[in-house]
Curated annotation (Swiss-Prot):
Taxonomic source organism: Physcomitrium patens
Active site: 131
Gene null: resulting phenotype: Significantly reduced levels of SnRK2 proteins activated by NaCl or abscisic acid (ABA) compared with wild-type.
Reactions catalysed: L-seryl-[protein] + ATP = O-phospho-L-seryl-[protein] + ADP + H(+); L-threonyl-[protein] + ATP = O-phospho-L-threonyl-[protein] + ADP + H(+)
Ways its activity is controlled: Activated by osmotic stress and by abscisic acid (ABA). Activation by NaCl is dependent on ABA.
Gene coding for it: SRK2A
Source domain of life: Eukaryota
Name by which UniProt lists this protein: Serine/threonine-protein kinase SRK2A
PANTHER family in UniProt: SERINE/THREONINE KINASE (PTHR24343), SERINE_THREONINE-PROTEIN KINASE SRK2E (PTHR24343:SF509)
Region (Activation loop) residue spans: 151-177
Keywords annotated in UniProt: ATP-binding, Kinase, Nucleotide-binding, Phosphoprotein, Serine/threonine-protein kinase, Stress response, Transferase
Induction field: Up-regulated in response to NaCl treatment.
Function: Involved in early responses to osmotic stress.
Length: 349
Protein backbone atom coordinates (compact mmCIF):
# COMPACT_ATOMS: atom_id res chain seq x y z
CA UNK A 1 0.00 0.00 0.00
CA UNK A 2 1.69 3.20 -1.16
CA UNK A 3 1.82 6.42 0.80
CA UNK A 4 1.13 9.35 -1.56
CA UNK A 5 4.13 11.44 -2.56
CA UNK A 6 5.07 14.47 -0.48
CA UNK A 7 2.87 17.20 -1.97
CA UNK A 8 4.36 18.75 -5.10
CA UNK A 9 8.11 18.64 -4.54
CA UNK A 10 8.48 14.94 -3.76
CA UNK A 11 11.59 15.43 -1.65
CA UNK A 12 11.84 11.92 -0.19
CA UNK A 13 11.93 8.38 -1.51
CA UNK A 14 10.73 5.31 0.37
CA UNK A 15 13.31 2.88 1.77
CA UNK A 16 11.13 0.61 3.94
CA UNK A 17 8.40 0.46 6.58
CA UNK A 18 9.77 0.67 10.12
CA UNK A 19 6.67 0.56 12.33
CA UNK A 20 2.96 1.05 12.79
CA UNK A 21 0.53 1.86 15.58
CA UNK A 22 -2.73 3.60 16.33
CA UNK A 23 -1.22 6.77 14.81
CA UNK A 24 -0.65 5.21 11.36
CA UNK A 25 2.70 4.08 9.97
CA UNK A 26 6.34 5.10 10.25
CA UNK A 27 8.60 4.78 7.25
CA UNK A 28 12.30 5.07 6.59
CA UNK A 29 12.79 7.60 3.80
CA UNK A 30 15.80 9.05 2.01
CA UNK A 31 16.22 12.71 1.16
CA UNK A 32 16.79 12.65 -2.60
CA UNK A 33 19.02 15.72 -2.45
CA UNK A 34 21.24 15.02 0.57
CA UNK A 35 20.82 11.19 0.67
CA UNK A 36 20.18 11.53 4.41
CA UNK A 37 17.96 8.88 5.98
CA UNK A 38 14.98 10.19 7.95
CA UNK A 39 12.06 8.63 9.78
CA UNK A 40 8.63 9.84 8.66
CA UNK A 41 5.55 9.28 10.78
CA UNK A 42 2.33 9.41 8.73
CA UNK A 43 -0.94 10.26 10.45
CA UNK A 44 -4.18 10.10 8.52
CA UNK A 45 -5.76 13.46 7.88
CA UNK A 46 -9.05 14.27 9.56
CA UNK A 47 -10.11 13.43 13.11
CA UNK A 48 -6.81 11.70 13.99
CA UNK A 49 -5.08 15.09 13.85
CA UNK A 50 -6.06 15.86 17.43
CA UNK A 51 -4.64 17.79 20.38
CA UNK A 52 -2.09 15.04 21.08
CA UNK A 53 -0.67 15.32 17.57
CA UNK A 54 -0.48 19.11 17.77
CA UNK A 55 1.16 18.93 21.21
CA UNK A 56 3.67 16.34 20.01
CA UNK A 57 4.75 18.49 17.09
CA UNK A 58 4.93 21.82 18.92
CA UNK A 59 6.76 20.39 21.94
CA UNK A 60 9.10 18.21 19.89
CA UNK A 61 9.98 21.15 17.62
CA UNK A 62 11.38 23.10 20.59
CA UNK A 63 13.76 20.33 21.75
CA UNK A 64 17.33 20.10 20.48
CA UNK A 65 19.54 17.71 22.41
CA UNK A 66 21.78 14.72 21.55
CA UNK A 67 19.55 12.37 23.59
CA UNK A 68 16.32 13.42 21.89
CA UNK A 69 15.28 12.41 18.38
CA UNK A 70 15.59 15.56 16.29
CA UNK A 71 12.40 17.03 14.81
CA UNK A 72 12.91 18.21 11.22
CA UNK A 73 9.61 19.33 9.68
CA UNK A 74 5.96 18.57 9.06
CA UNK A 75 4.53 18.16 5.58
CA UNK A 76 1.19 17.33 3.99
CA UNK A 77 0.32 14.61 1.52
CA UNK A 78 -3.13 14.47 -0.06
CA UNK A 79 -4.19 11.96 2.60
CA UNK A 80 -1.74 12.26 5.51
CA UNK A 81 0.17 14.57 7.80
CA UNK A 82 3.85 13.60 7.72
CA UNK A 83 6.21 14.29 10.63
CA UNK A 84 9.84 14.13 9.48
CA UNK A 85 12.47 13.40 12.13
CA UNK A 86 15.94 12.05 12.72
CA UNK A 87 16.32 8.33 12.02
CA UNK A 88 17.69 6.23 14.88
CA UNK A 89 19.26 3.22 13.15
CA UNK A 90 19.71 1.15 16.33
CA UNK A 91 15.99 0.59 16.93
CA UNK A 92 14.23 0.48 20.30
CA UNK A 93 16.04 0.00 23.60
CA UNK A 94 13.18 -2.43 24.33
CA UNK A 95 14.38 -4.73 21.53
CA UNK A 96 17.93 -4.66 22.85
CA UNK A 97 16.75 -5.83 26.27
CA UNK A 98 14.58 -8.53 24.73
CA UNK A 99 17.61 -9.85 22.89
CA UNK A 100 19.84 -9.67 25.98
CA UNK A 101 17.31 -10.82 28.61
CA UNK A 102 18.62 -8.12 30.91
CA UNK A 103 21.61 -5.80 31.11
CA UNK A 104 24.63 -5.76 33.37
CA UNK A 105 24.60 -2.96 35.91
CA UNK A 106 27.25 -1.05 33.94
CA UNK A 107 25.29 -1.30 30.68
CA UNK A 108 22.05 -0.28 32.40
CA UNK A 109 23.83 2.71 33.93
CA UNK A 110 25.26 3.71 30.52
CA UNK A 111 21.76 4.01 29.06
CA UNK A 112 20.18 5.42 32.24
CA UNK A 113 22.73 8.26 32.31
CA UNK A 114 21.72 9.22 28.78
CA UNK A 115 18.01 8.90 29.56
CA UNK A 116 18.36 11.24 32.54
CA UNK A 117 20.40 13.67 30.45
CA UNK A 118 17.60 13.89 27.88
CA UNK A 119 14.81 14.07 30.45
CA UNK A 120 16.69 16.73 32.41
CA UNK A 121 16.92 18.83 29.25
CA UNK A 122 13.18 18.39 28.55
CA UNK A 123 12.40 19.56 32.07
CA UNK A 124 14.73 22.55 31.69
CA UNK A 125 12.62 23.46 28.65
CA UNK A 126 9.52 23.14 30.88
CA UNK A 127 8.31 20.02 29.06
CA UNK A 128 7.45 16.79 30.86
CA UNK A 129 7.23 13.72 28.64
CA UNK A 130 4.55 11.72 30.54
CA UNK A 131 5.07 8.52 28.53
CA UNK A 132 8.67 7.54 29.13
CA UNK A 133 9.19 3.84 28.46
CA UNK A 134 11.63 1.56 26.70
CA UNK A 135 9.57 1.63 23.49
CA UNK A 136 9.96 5.42 23.40
CA UNK A 137 13.74 5.29 23.71
CA UNK A 138 15.61 4.63 20.49
CA UNK A 139 19.30 4.05 19.77
CA UNK A 140 21.51 5.39 17.03
CA UNK A 141 23.67 2.99 15.05
CA UNK A 142 27.02 3.68 16.73
CA UNK A 143 29.02 0.91 18.51
CA UNK A 144 28.42 2.60 21.89
CA UNK A 145 24.81 3.55 21.12
CA UNK A 146 23.48 7.00 21.87
CA UNK A 147 20.02 6.88 23.41
CA UNK A 148 17.32 9.05 21.79
CA UNK A 149 14.00 9.87 23.46
CA UNK A 150 11.06 9.99 21.05
CA UNK A 151 7.25 10.22 20.92
CA UNK A 152 6.06 13.43 22.57
CA UNK A 153 2.36 12.75 21.98
CA UNK A 154 1.52 12.90 25.69
CA UNK A 155 4.04 15.57 26.64
CA UNK A 156 2.92 18.66 28.48
CA UNK A 157 4.53 22.09 28.52
CA UNK A 158 4.05 24.15 31.65
CA UNK A 159 4.61 27.20 29.46
CA UNK A 160 1.61 26.36 27.29
CA UNK A 161 -0.60 24.11 29.41
CA UNK A 162 -1.85 23.73 32.97
CA UNK A 163 -0.49 21.14 35.38
CA UNK A 164 -1.44 17.71 34.03
CA UNK A 165 -4.17 15.74 35.75
CA UNK A 166 -5.21 13.19 33.14
CA UNK A 167 -4.00 9.61 33.45
CA UNK A 168 -1.80 9.05 30.45
CA UNK A 169 1.13 6.79 29.87
CA UNK A 170 1.62 3.05 29.79
CA UNK A 171 0.33 1.03 32.78
CA UNK A 172 3.58 -0.53 33.97
CA UNK A 173 5.33 2.86 34.01
CA UNK A 174 2.63 5.03 35.65
CA UNK A 175 3.49 6.83 38.90
CA UNK A 176 1.06 6.49 41.86
CA UNK A 177 0.05 10.15 41.83
CA UNK A 178 -0.93 9.93 38.15
CA UNK A 179 -3.61 7.43 39.14
CA UNK A 180 -5.14 9.89 41.61
CA UNK A 181 -6.89 11.99 38.94
CA UNK A 182 -5.70 15.12 40.76
CA UNK A 183 -3.13 17.59 39.53
CA UNK A 184 0.41 16.28 39.73
CA UNK A 185 3.91 17.41 38.87
CA UNK A 186 4.66 15.79 35.53
CA UNK A 187 8.41 16.15 36.04
CA UNK A 188 8.36 14.08 39.23
CA UNK A 189 6.10 11.52 37.53
CA UNK A 190 8.71 11.27 34.76
CA UNK A 191 11.28 10.35 37.43
CA UNK A 192 9.15 7.35 38.44
CA UNK A 193 8.96 6.21 34.80
CA UNK A 194 12.75 6.53 34.51
CA UNK A 195 13.00 4.27 37.57
CA UNK A 196 10.79 1.66 35.92
CA UNK A 197 12.99 1.81 32.84
CA UNK A 198 16.10 1.28 34.98
CA UNK A 199 14.50 -1.65 36.81
CA UNK A 200 13.49 -3.35 33.54
CA UNK A 201 17.01 -2.96 32.17
CA UNK A 202 18.45 -4.60 35.30
CA UNK A 203 15.84 -7.32 35.88
CA UNK A 204 14.20 -7.96 32.51
CA UNK A 205 10.71 -7.67 34.01
CA UNK A 206 8.35 -4.89 35.07
CA UNK A 207 8.63 -3.99 38.79
CA UNK A 208 4.92 -3.79 39.63
CA UNK A 209 3.45 -6.66 37.64
CA UNK A 210 2.77 -9.95 39.37
CA UNK A 211 4.96 -12.47 37.53
CA UNK A 212 2.27 -15.10 38.13
CA UNK A 213 -0.48 -12.85 36.73
CA UNK A 214 1.15 -10.11 34.63
CA UNK A 215 -2.00 -9.13 32.74
CA UNK A 216 -4.03 -8.45 35.87
CA UNK A 217 -4.31 -4.70 35.50
CA UNK A 218 -6.05 -4.18 38.84
CA UNK A 219 -3.28 -6.01 40.66
CA UNK A 220 -0.60 -3.97 38.85
CA UNK A 221 -2.26 -0.72 39.92
CA UNK A 222 -2.55 -1.98 43.50
CA UNK A 223 1.16 -2.79 43.52
CA UNK A 224 2.02 0.63 42.11
CA UNK A 225 -0.07 2.43 44.74
CA UNK A 226 1.52 0.39 47.55
CA UNK A 227 4.99 0.50 45.94
CA UNK A 228 5.22 -3.28 46.09
CA UNK A 229 8.31 -4.39 44.19
CA UNK A 230 11.36 -6.53 44.83
CA UNK A 231 14.63 -7.38 43.15
CA UNK A 232 14.92 -11.13 42.45
CA UNK A 233 17.72 -13.05 44.13
CA UNK A 234 19.27 -13.95 40.78
CA UNK A 235 19.85 -10.25 39.98
CA UNK A 236 23.04 -9.01 41.61
CA UNK A 237 23.22 -5.22 41.77
CA UNK A 238 25.14 -2.86 44.01
CA UNK A 239 23.92 -1.29 47.23
CA UNK A 240 24.15 2.13 45.56
CA UNK A 241 21.88 1.03 42.72
CA UNK A 242 19.33 -0.41 45.15
CA UNK A 243 19.44 2.85 47.08
CA UNK A 244 18.70 4.89 43.96
CA UNK A 245 15.73 2.67 43.07
CA UNK A 246 14.40 3.01 46.63
CA UNK A 247 14.60 6.81 46.31
CA UNK A 248 12.76 6.77 42.98
CA UNK A 249 10.02 4.33 43.96
CA UNK A 250 8.46 6.55 46.63
CA UNK A 251 4.67 6.94 46.58
CA UNK A 252 4.69 10.52 47.88
CA UNK A 253 6.04 12.63 44.99
CA UNK A 254 7.18 15.34 47.42
CA UNK A 255 9.58 12.82 48.99
CA UNK A 256 10.74 11.24 45.73
CA UNK A 257 14.21 12.00 44.42
CA UNK A 258 14.21 14.62 41.66
CA UNK A 259 16.22 14.74 38.44
CA UNK A 260 18.95 17.00 39.84
CA UNK A 261 19.37 14.73 42.87
CA UNK A 262 19.62 11.72 40.56
CA UNK A 263 22.37 13.52 38.62
CA UNK A 264 24.25 13.99 41.90
CA UNK A 265 23.71 10.41 43.10
CA UNK A 266 26.80 8.28 43.67
CA UNK A 267 25.56 5.47 41.40
CA UNK A 268 24.67 7.83 38.54
CA UNK A 269 28.04 9.61 38.67
CA UNK A 270 30.11 6.42 38.38
CA UNK A 271 31.71 6.15 34.91
CA UNK A 272 29.71 9.15 33.73
CA UNK A 273 30.79 9.77 30.10
CA UNK A 274 32.67 13.03 29.62
CA UNK A 275 30.25 14.20 26.95
CA UNK A 276 27.38 14.02 29.45
CA UNK A 277 29.16 15.94 32.21
CA UNK A 278 28.75 19.38 30.71
CA UNK A 279 25.72 18.83 28.45
CA UNK A 280 23.62 21.13 30.60
CA UNK A 281 25.98 24.01 29.87
CA UNK A 282 25.97 23.60 26.10
CA UNK A 283 23.62 25.10 23.55
CA UNK A 284 22.21 22.72 20.97
CA UNK A 285 20.08 25.31 19.25
CA UNK A 286 21.87 24.70 15.96
CA UNK A 287 20.18 24.92 12.60
CA UNK A 288 20.21 22.20 9.98
CA UNK A 289 20.91 23.94 6.65
CA UNK A 290 18.90 21.27 4.85
CA UNK A 291 15.95 21.69 7.23
CA UNK A 292 15.61 25.35 8.26
CA UNK A 293 13.24 25.47 11.24
CA UNK A 294 9.57 25.85 10.39
CA UNK A 295 7.82 28.67 12.18
CA UNK A 296 5.08 27.90 14.68
CA UNK A 297 2.69 29.73 12.36
CA UNK A 298 3.58 27.53 9.39
CA UNK A 299 3.29 24.36 11.46
CA UNK A 300 -0.11 25.41 12.84
CA UNK A 301 -1.30 26.19 9.32
CA UNK A 302 -0.25 22.72 8.13
CA UNK A 303 -1.88 21.05 11.15
CA UNK A 304 -5.07 23.03 10.57
CA UNK A 305 -5.13 21.97 6.92
CA UNK A 306 -4.45 18.36 7.93
CA UNK A 307 -7.61 18.33 10.06
CA UNK A 308 -9.57 18.47 6.81
CA UNK A 309 -9.91 15.03 5.24
CA UNK A 310 -7.84 15.12 2.08
CA UNK A 311 -9.05 14.10 -1.34
CA UNK A 312 -8.60 10.39 -1.72
CA UNK A 313 -8.57 9.73 2.05
CA UNK A 314 -10.65 6.69 2.86
CA UNK A 315 -11.01 7.09 6.60
CA UNK A 316 -9.69 3.56 7.15
CA UNK A 317 -6.30 3.75 5.47
CA UNK A 318 -4.63 1.99 8.40
CA UNK A 319 -5.83 -0.61 10.86
CA UNK A 320 -6.72 0.49 14.36
CA UNK A 321 -4.91 -2.29 16.19
CA UNK A 322 -1.95 -1.44 18.39
CA UNK A 323 0.17 -3.85 20.39
CA UNK A 324 1.12 -1.69 23.34
CA UNK A 325 -1.79 -0.12 25.19
CA UNK A 326 -1.39 3.56 25.94
CA UNK A 327 -3.93 5.03 28.31
CA UNK A 328 -5.51 8.06 26.76
CA UNK A 329 -8.38 8.24 29.22
CA UNK A 330 -8.58 8.31 32.99
CA UNK A 331 -7.85 5.00 34.66
CA UNK A 332 -10.22 3.39 37.09
CA UNK A 333 -8.22 1.34 39.63
CA UNK A 334 -11.26 -0.95 39.93
CA UNK A 335 -11.36 -1.60 36.21
CA UNK A 336 -11.96 -5.06 34.82
CA UNK A 337 -8.89 -7.09 35.76
CA UNK A 338 -8.89 -8.70 32.33
CA UNK A 339 -7.76 -5.45 30.71
CA UNK A 340 -4.24 -6.09 29.45
CA UNK A 341 -1.36 -4.10 30.90
CA UNK A 342 1.75 -3.15 29.02
CA UNK A 343 2.70 -6.79 28.74
CA UNK A 344 4.24 -9.76 30.43
CA UNK A 345 7.88 -10.14 31.33
CA UNK A 346 9.96 -8.26 28.82
CA UNK A 347 11.56 -11.58 27.95
CA UNK A 348 11.23 -15.09 29.24
CA UNK A 349 13.90 -15.75 31.82
Amino acid sequence: MDIPSMHDHDRYELVKDIGSGNFGVARLMRDKKTRELVAVKYIERGEKIDENVQREIINHRSLRHPNIVRFKEVMLTPTHLAIVMEYAAGGELFERICNAGRFSEDEARFFFQQLISGVSYCHSMQICHRDLKLENTLLDGSPAPRLKICDFGYSKSSLLHSQPKSTVGTPAYIAPEVLSKKEYDGKIADVWSCGVTLYVMLVGAYPFEDPEDPRNFRKTIGRILSVQYSIPDYVHISVECRHLLSRIFVANPAKRINIQEIKNHEWFLKNLPADLVDLADRSYDFEDPNHPPQSIEEIMRIISEARVLGTGATGDYFGDSVDDMDLENDVDPDADPDVGSSGEFVCAM
